[in-house]
């Protein structure tokens, strides 16, 4: 294929391949948080292949491409895959959990729920920092150079944007999510999840939001 050969005019194909492979793996990673230690490895691999190779690809073709029908018909805008990665993965995991049921020990015989807390705050913070670093790579892959009719730096749809907008709004979203979750729970473990909620809540429009708006959206998501 000519696509595999050297082509100095093609600035996007290799980026798309790497980014879409990363995002397919990310869908399985998101699902793993719901089923880890609860299903067999073979079962997880099967679910990961279905989610990353079929379900997510359909969502990406519909809403994460300039010619996708959600984009052309309804103006759907999801610059950093808030919907086509995280929402799709979340609902897929929900479908698995409906059949799997609650974790052992989550509920008592009378129906009351037990709080299953994290076992190590330092490990949780370390994990959050690694995820934040990964988010910058994830988000940076959504900014393309010389792609589409506008040229220069563009989003996944070919619209003009800047890498600065993505980076700064990502920082604002992380801060907003952490603060919003702390305001609601006063729990350091939940604050770590609040950072993720903040980024995911604001991710769809990181190329559009005014920074305080990105913070406000993330605060609401974390809260």
Regions found by a protein language model. Give the residues of each.
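Hydrophobic alpha-helical transmembrane bundles of multi-pass membrane proteins
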Residues: 1-223
């Amino acid at each position: 294929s000519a696509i595999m050969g050297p082509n100095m005019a093609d600035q996007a194909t290799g980026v798309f391949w790497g980014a879409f492979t990363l995002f397919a793996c990310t869908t399985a990673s998101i699902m793993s948080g719901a089923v880890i230690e609860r299903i067999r490895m073979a079962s997880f691999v099967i679910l990961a292949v279905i989610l990353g190779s079929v379900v997510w690809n359909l969502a990406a073709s519909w809403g994460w491409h300039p010619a996708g029908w959600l984009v052309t018909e309804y103006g759907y805008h999801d610059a950093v895959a808030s919907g086509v990665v995280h929402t799709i993965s979340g609902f897929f995991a929900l479908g698995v959990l409906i059949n799997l049921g609650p974790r052992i020990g989550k509920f008592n015989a009378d129906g009351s729920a037990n709080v299953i807390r994290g076992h190590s705050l330092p490990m949780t913070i370390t994990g959050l920092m690694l995820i934040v670093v990964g988010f910058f790579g994830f988000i940076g892959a959504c900014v393309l150079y010389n792609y589409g009719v506008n040229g220069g730096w563009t989003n996944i749809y070919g619209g003009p944007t800047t890498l600065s907008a993505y980076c700064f709004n990502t920082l604002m979203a992380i801060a907003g999510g952490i603060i919003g979750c702390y305001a609601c729970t006063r729990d350091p473990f939940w604050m770590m999840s609040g950072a993720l909620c903040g980024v995911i809540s604001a991710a769809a429009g990181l190329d559009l939001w005014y920074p305080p708006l990105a913070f406000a959206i993330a605060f609401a998501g974390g809260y």
